[in-house]
């Protein structure tokens, strides 16, 4: 349940499990809008598909890349809600909680992508990696901003 007390973000475990993937879906749909506008914007999901299949990023299965994108987005929403809940116990569930959760989530998303799948992907030369990392950082920022807004709206933090 969402607590009315002091405008805190407080979710029960069950509510958090239900809300997290929904938050992630909304944030992923917003991310899609950003991805479509960037030169390497649609490359990050293909990076994940490349790692899983061993194929080049440019020939990785599009359907698999899309599936990975949305499943990872839903899972990241669950992670964001969990981080916000944990930080809420320490910071009191205020706007500071969502700010701190956003910083942690963005760091995890960008760091994980830059150090785990991107270096393992096939067909991404060093020069292109920098452009893909930059695109991912912009997309992840959009994701986190929307996730924070949705959690704030649901948790009545705003």
Regions found by a protein language model. Name each.
Residues 1-158:
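Juxtamembrane/disordered regions of integral membrane proteins
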């Amino acid at each position: 349940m969402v607590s009315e007390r002091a405008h805190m973000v407080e979710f029960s475990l069950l509510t958090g499990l239900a809300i997290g993937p929904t938050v992630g879906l909304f944030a992923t749909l917003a991310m899609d809008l950003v991805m479509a506008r960037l030169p390497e914007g649609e490359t990050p999901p293909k990076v994940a598909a490349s790692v899983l299949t061993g194929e080049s990023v440019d020939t990785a299965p599009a359907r698999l890349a899309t599936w990975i994108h949305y499943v990872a987005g839903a899972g990241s929403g669950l992670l964001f809600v969990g981080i916000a809940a944990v930080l809420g116990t320490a910071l009191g569930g205020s706007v500071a909680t969502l700010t701190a959760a956003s910083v942690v989530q963005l760091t995890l998303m960008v760091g994980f992508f830059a150090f785990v799948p991107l270096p393992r992907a096939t067909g991404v030369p060093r020069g292109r990696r920098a452009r893909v990392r930059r695109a991912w950082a912009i997309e992840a920022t959009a994701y986190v901003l929307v996730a924070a807004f949705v959690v704030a709206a649901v948790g009545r933090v705003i």
